[in-house]
Amino acid sequence: MKNRFSIALALVMALVMAFASATLADADATAEFDPDAHIAALAGSYTELFKTIAAPEMDDKWLEKCTAIVGEESAEAASEMLRTACTAEIFGQDAIDAYTQDPDSARFDCYFQGGIVTFVFDGNKVSGLDADGNEVFAHEYYYVQDIPDVIACHVYKTDDADAGEFTYLCLSDDTPAETYHIEFRYGDDLDALGQYYEGKYAYWLAAGILSDADDKMIDDCIQLFVDENLASEEAA
C-alpha cells in the first residue's frame, strides 16, 4: 500500500491548525464572544498536553483509533506522525533555521515555555508554577482584542509592569468542556505572537490538559486529534 504519512511541512502545519477546532470563523461569532465567560471556562490546573496524550502508555490508544480510520497497514505510520507533529523541542529562530535547512523535519513545539510546568486559571487570574511547585508568575488578565487571522485567538493582557514574557495571553476558543484541552500562546511581543512561522515565537503553540484529567477526557482528546487530522483519509 502507498504510504500517505510522510511528515511533510504542509501536513504538519495542517495538523496543528486542525486541532484548534474553533477558528473565530465569522463576525457574528466574534461579536457574541464573552471574554470573561471564556477565561472563566478554563478554570483549573493544566499540565502539558502532549506529555500526557503522547506518553508511551498511550500508544495502543493511538494505534487503535488510527486503525479505525486508515486501516491496519497505515495505522502505525499515521499514529507516529500524529504523536510527533507537535512535540518538537525548538521554536523561534532555532526552529526557523532548522526547518529552512530541512523543511521535511518541520514540527511544532507545543510545550510550556519560561520554566512553567503547570498553568493555573482562576477567573481572570492566571499563574504558572515550576517543577517544584514554586510560583513563577501570577497576574490578572483583561481582554484587549482578537487576532482573527493566522493564529485565531483572543488576546488578554496584564497591566503589571513586571510581567515580561507573561504580558500577553492569547487564548484559542478551546475549553476542556468542549475540546478536552486548551491551546494558547504568551509573551511580551503581540506582533510576534500573531505569527506562526516567523519571529521569536515561530513554530510554538502551547497546549494543555487538566492536571486531573480522567481516562475518558484523555481518550476523548486523542480521539479528537485523530478524527480531525485523519478524517479525509480512506482505509484501503
Locations of regions flagged by a protein language model:
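Short, solvent-exposed loop/hinge segments that bridge or flank secondary-structure elements
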Residues: 36, 47-124, 165-175
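Extreme N-terminus of proteins, especially the signal/transit-peptide cleavage junction
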Residues: 31-37
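Bacterial N-terminal signal peptides that target proteins for export
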Residues: 1-9
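A glycine-anchored, Pro-Gly-centered beta-turn/N-cap motif
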Residues: 40-45
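Calycin-type beta-barrel ligand-binding domains and close structural analogs
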Residues: 100-236
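Bacterial N-terminal signal peptides
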Residues: 10-19
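Polar/charged side chains located within well-ordered beta-strands of beta-rich proteins
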Residues: 17, 46, 181-183
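Sec-dependent signal peptide cleavage junction
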Residues: 18-31
